[in-house]
Amino acid sequence: MGGTTDFVLSITIVLVILIIIAFIWYNFTGWSPFKYSKGNTVTFKTPDESSIAYMRFKNCVFTFTDPKGSLHSVDVTNVLNNMAKGFRDAQNPPSSFTLGGHCQAPLNAFSFILPGVNDRATVATADEAKKWENCDATLTGLQRII
């Protein structure tokens, strides 16, 4: 009975070590930073033409100023990850995607919506939207292919 217990304990220890190694590998290796500023077209592309569905994002923050000069930030990590994962079931998934889709809209204060700040209810008219033309916007974070 002692031999069986020792074997099970050994296997359990090996599995725990492998899980720890996998956790360290995923969280601390292979991430490359990106930064886009106002006016840039935001395009994420895989380096080896693999499917964009395998791209993952971490610590992605969209920061922008409003016409009054107030600074706003929103974590958009889940948004970007879900955009990439959305290509999983495509028959011919692309190797890149552009924020804004086919419009290829440059990064601006409306690239991501923060309710109560830059949503349609708050900025309801074209005249109000024009006030936002000179507002800064940045998108920063980490990306990797899994």
Swiss-Prot record:
Task: Give the protein family.
Answer: Belongs to the asfivirus E146L family.
Keyword Transmembrane among UniProt keywords: yes
Per UniProt, which keywords does this protein have? Host membrane, Membrane, Transmembrane, Transmembrane helix, Virion
GO CC, sorted alphabetically, is: host cell membrane; membrane; virion component
Q: Please list every transmembrane segment annotated in the UniProt record, as residue ranges.
A: 7-27
Please tell me the species this chain comes from.
African swine fever virus (isolate Tick/Malawi/Lil 20-1/1983) (ASFV)
According to UniProt, the name of this protein is Uncharacterized protein E146L
Summarize induction of expression. Answer: Expressed in the late phase of the viral replicative cycle.
UniProt entry tagged with the keyword Aminoacyl-tRNA synthetase:
no
| Compartmental location | Host membrane; Virion
- Disulphide bonds in the chain: none
UniProt topology in membrane: Single-pass membrane protein
